[in-house]
């Protein structure tokens, strides 16, 4: 089960993650993220312990992605299993088909979308979007340090663990 405490998660956050993520945010998105109510990130103790507590939209999107896109090939610019998904195409399809929220097919455009609300990495839950400094996006799972996404050419859509050189720099919840 989930044995990492919230305090331990905070200690493992990357130094400077906020600065890196701020560099990714399109003009106007920072103000929208800052204006989001603080209550959006609050979750119950049982939700923290279980790893759940993300939005309904995020849970629905991850369920759709795991059921419909797992095992499909990566294809740059793709947004369906044939020919394949790229990272933002998978997120767009998962939230569109799974939750009825159609996000743009571009990682950078997603950051400025009104449905995304910035949260700290330690507050990330199942279904939240995890952005990487390289312009990559994946969907968070309930497992600490693991995301679901379309990674790169030659790989299939699926789970990926974080590593010292590959980890998110920003997290967003979709409402």
Please give the residue ranges for each predicted region.
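Short, surface-exposed, polar/charged, turn-prone segments marking secondary-structure boundaries
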Residues: 93-96, 102-103, 158-160, 168, ...
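...with weaker cross-activation on analogous glycine-rich loops/strands in unrelated enzymes
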Residues: 2, 100-163
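Catalytic cysteine-centered active-site loop
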Residues: 51-55, 67-126
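Intrinsically disordered, low-complexity
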Residues: 2-73, 122, 144, 162-175
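Residue-level preference for alpha-helix termini and adjacent loops
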Residues: 13, 24, 73-75, 84, ...
């Amino acid at each position: 089960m989930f044995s990492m405490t919230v305090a331990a998660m905070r200690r493992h956050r990357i130094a400077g993650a906020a600065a890196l993520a701020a560099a990714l945010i399109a003009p106007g998105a920072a103000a929208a993220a800052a204006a989001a109510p603080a209550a959006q990130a609050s979750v119950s103790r049982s939700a923290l312990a279980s790893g759940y507590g993300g939005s309904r939209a995020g849970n629905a999107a991850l369920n759709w992605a795991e059921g419909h896109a797992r095992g499909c090939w990566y294809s740059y610019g793709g947004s369906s299993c044939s020919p394949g998904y790229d990272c933002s195409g998978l997120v767009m399809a998962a939230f569109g088909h799974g939750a009825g929220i159609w996000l743009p097919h571009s990682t950078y455009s997603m950051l400025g979308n009104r449905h995304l609300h910035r949260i700290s990495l330690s507050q990330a839950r199942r279904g939240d979007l995890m952005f990487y400094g390289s312009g990559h996006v994946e969907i968070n799972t309930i497992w600490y340090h693991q995301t679901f996404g379309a990674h790169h050419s030659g790989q299939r859509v699926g789970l990926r663990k974080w590593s010292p050189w590959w980890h998110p720099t920003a997290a967003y919840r979709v409402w």
